[in-house]
Amino acid sequence: KNNRNDIVRRLYRKPNKGLIGVDISSTSVKVLELSMKSGRYWVESYALVPLPEGSVVEKNILNPEAVGDALARAINLANTQSNQAAFAIPTSMAITKTIEMDADMTSDEREVQIREDAEQYIPFPLDEASLDFEVLPDRLTNPNRVNVLLVATRLENIESRCEVIELAGLTPK
């Protein structure tokens, strides 16, 4: 199990030193610490720790404590300096849709519009969804329009991964 001193050490790491990427599969937890130097990303450390069988089944976390323990071991193996972690959501758990929007909208206006229109793109209730979007760099024939990538997943997919990250003494970002 987790050593209490290791958890305390992770809690007091410098919060913005870098970012830890976390990938949870059915067989392992992988971590990769990135930092920014001279405008470029650098891999500072990485590790892979196997998971006990049955901890993650069909991409669903069934045993958060076991996965959190494996993540904590991976963090210790990688000797990361950050306490902030971002995680991947399996593509099978995400819904993506490219939508065309006015180019002159602010980010806040775009978010309001996406939330108003999201029900037509997402096959589950919005109060059960986590949404994100990104303006794509590709140019459309109409310079007044942009393509926006909308990504949605069920909140439970986010919450289960946040729980694992917090169990390992990290802060989800």
Q: Could you describe each region identified by the protein language model?
A:
Residues 9-10, 75-76, 138-139:
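Short, flexible, glycine/charge-rich loop motifs used to bind or transfer phosphoryl groups or to couple energy/partner
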Residues 26, 62, 66-70, 90, ...:
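Generic alpha-helix structural propensity
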Residues 3-50, 83-90, 168:
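Gly/Thr-rich phosphate-binding beta-strand-loop-beta motif of the actin/hexokinase/Hsp70
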Residues 78-81:
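Glycine-rich phosphate-binding loop signature in dinucleotide/nucleotide-binding domains
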Residues 47-76:
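N-terminal phosphate-binding loop and adjacent alpha-helix
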Residues 39, 46, 55-56, 140:
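Oxyanion-binding/catalytic loops of NTP- or PPi-dependent enzymes
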Residues 41, 57-59, 94-98:
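Switch/connector loops and helix/strand junctions flanking conserved nucleotide-binding motifs
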Residues 84, 88-173:
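Active-site neighborhood for divalent-cation/phosphate handling
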